[in-house]
Design a protein with these regions (language model features):
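Bacterial Sec-dependent N-terminal signal peptides
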Residues: 13-49
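Active-site-adjacent "subsite" loops/lids of carbohydrate-active enzymes
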Residues: 46-68, 148-222, 274-281
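Catalytic domains of carbohydrate-active enzymes, especially glycoside hydrolases
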Residues: 72-99, 222-226, 352-365, 426-435
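Aromatic-lined carbohydrate-binding/catalytic grooves of carbohydrate-active enzymes
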Residues: 86-128
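Glycine-rich, aromatic-flanked loop segments that form ligand/cofactor-binding clefts
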Residues: 86-97, 132-191, 229-232, 308-313
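Aromatic- and acidic-residue-enriched segments that line the glycan-binding/catalytic groove
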Residues: 101-114, 155-194, 232-272, 325-337
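Substrate-binding cleft/loops of secretory-pathway carbohydrate-active enzymes
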Residues: 156-159, 163, 238, 306, ...
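Substrate-binding cleft of secreted/luminal carbohydrate-active enzymes
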Residues: 346-463
């Protein structure tokens, strides 16, 4: 009876949070059945998934020293990943440099990544010529895993203390593709910013969007690929200072029907929405989310145009309460923001329509809470992130949430094997689309192979 009461309560909560429209996943049965067609017509039959999907992320830079030049190592680890009980890989094939680890006619190949190796930050070079993504697809399928390609989306270069790499450095004529931020020194193109890190692209730039859609079309045509996941599909920063390119100003003027009365819209140093934002500021924040929404919709259409059976999704941080700072609204269009979110009381009517969850086949929520914050009902607890995610998505798309087991508070030095069974159980019991773990490099670094196998085995025994 208590279980029934809990389920009814959860359903009532969803109904009050979301507009009362009929919902339904675009998830196709064959994606779970292991039958041919689950990831394209050329995908061999894969074992049926028992329980909910279990994804492990494979970051390009963090794993580059292992896989960039060794297809045999890829095959060996795919077997180990499957033996742990994972069902899916998300293989990063476009690191933050914007260069790619798959065959492309428009993007340069990734020949080096900056990474920590044996305690030193250095370049790891790729001299091998085998197709990196194809090697993962072949080895993953042979091990019984589904293989999804992850790409860092709105990026085009990486600036580090040991040098620079990426498209924006190789093509100075594309500087106008770069983000422009409202920094202390004034409006600054990302290529003129001294800070290290990714060089972000301008999401409002039509040339940037066309380039990325072409890239996604190439990726969707990859033989045997099961899915595509966009990462960093957002604006440059978390501080409301991004988006002030000439292309964005022109597009914003079109959106308003007039020239903006102030540019930049937000004052320097504004990191959160003001307590009483102006009409222009409300429209600007809505416009940025609309830009991302419209790109995600176009990306989904491009992927499914090339191959209707390739799943399309996005990774986002689960901390939605201030995710407007990145220009992203990952909720469903049906979600009632003003009613349910205390930090979104300022939104105009059009903001709700910028939610892009309805465009997706699956979505990944980064539940990156610390080791002492597994349980709870609020943000910055793993369980709370997942529960709130379910409310915000309104049942329109299956979601997988998961922890960062190497960088989140308390996980940095490993030795957290004892927590993994509880984390696995909590994520899989709370998320309708499974769980994901970030990242494979941390499983290797802290020797969590056996601990994850035990944790997933315990979950499977409950089915």
């Amino acid at each position: 009876m208590r279980k029934v009461t809990f389920i009814l309560g959860a359903l009532l909560l969803l109904l009050t949070a979301c507009a009362p429209e009929e919902t339904g996943y675009k998830w196709r049965e064959e994606w779970d059945s292991g039958q041919p067609g689950g990831g394209g017509d050329d995908t061999p039959g894969l074992p049926e998934i028992k329980g909910k999907p279990r994804y492990v992320w494979v970051d390009a830079a963090a794993n580059f020293s292992y896989y960039a030049n060794d297809a045999a190592y890829i095959a060996e680890d795919c077997k180990r990943i499957a033996a742990m009980g994972f069902t899916d890989l998300v293989v990063d094939v476009r690191p933050t440099s914007g260069d790619v680890l798959f065959t492309s006619a428009v993007a340069p190949p990734c020949l080096k990544c900056a990474a920590w190796v044996n305690g030193k930050y250095r370049w790891v070079e790729r001299t091998a010529t085998f197709d990196y993504l194809a090697a993962f697809i072949e080895a993953g399928h042979a091990a019984g895993l589904r293989v999804n390609a992850g790409i860092n989306t709105m990026v085009g270069g990486y600036h580090s203390a040991i040098g620079d790499v990426g498209m924006l450095y190789d093509h100075p004529e594309r500087k106008s593709w770069g983000a422009v931020d409202n920094l202390a020194a004034g409006l600054t193109n990302t290529m003129d910013d001294a800070d290290t890190g990714p060089r972000f692209l301008d999401p409002a730039n039509a040339d940037v969007q066309a380039f990325l859609l072409t890239l996604l079309g190439e990726l969707a045509g990859y033989e045997g690929l099961d899915g595509i996941v966009l990462d960093r599909c957002r604006y440059d920063d978390y501080n409301l200072d991004a988006g002030y390119t000439d292309a964005a100003k022109a597009a914003f003027a079109t959106y308003l029907g007039d020239e903006p009365s102030a540019w930049p819209v937000m004052p320097k140093g504004q990191t959160y929405v003001p307590s009483n934002p102006s009409t222009l500021q409300r429209n600007w924040l809505t416009f940025r989310c609309k830009v991302i929404h419209d790109f995600v919709a176009a990306a989904a259409a491009k992927v499914h145009e090339v191959n209707k059976d390739v799943r399309f999704g996005v990774y986002v941080g689960a901390w939605f309460s201030d995710y407007y700072r990145s220009g992203v609204n990952w909720t469903s269009e049906k979600y009632d923001l003003k009613k349910n979110e205390s930090t979104y009381k300022w939104v105009p009517t059009g903001y709700q329509k910028t939610g892009f969850a309805d465009q997706l086949d699956f979505i990944f929520l980064g539940a990156y809470a610390g080791k002492d914050s597994i349980h709870g009902s609020t943000e910055w607890t793993m369980e709370g992130f997942a529960k709130l995610g379910a409310q915000r998505l309104c049942g329109v798309v299956p979601f997988a949430a998961g922890p960062d087991i190497g960088n989140a508070t308390g996980f940095e030095n490993g030795k957290q094997e004892a927590l993994l069974p509880d984390i696995v159980k909590t994520m899989l019991s709370t998320c309708d689309g499974g769980m994901f773990i970030f990242d494979l490099c941390h499983i290797r670094m802290f020797d969590y192979w056996d601990a994850f196998k035990t944790s997933i085995d315990q979950y499977l025994e409950t089915l």
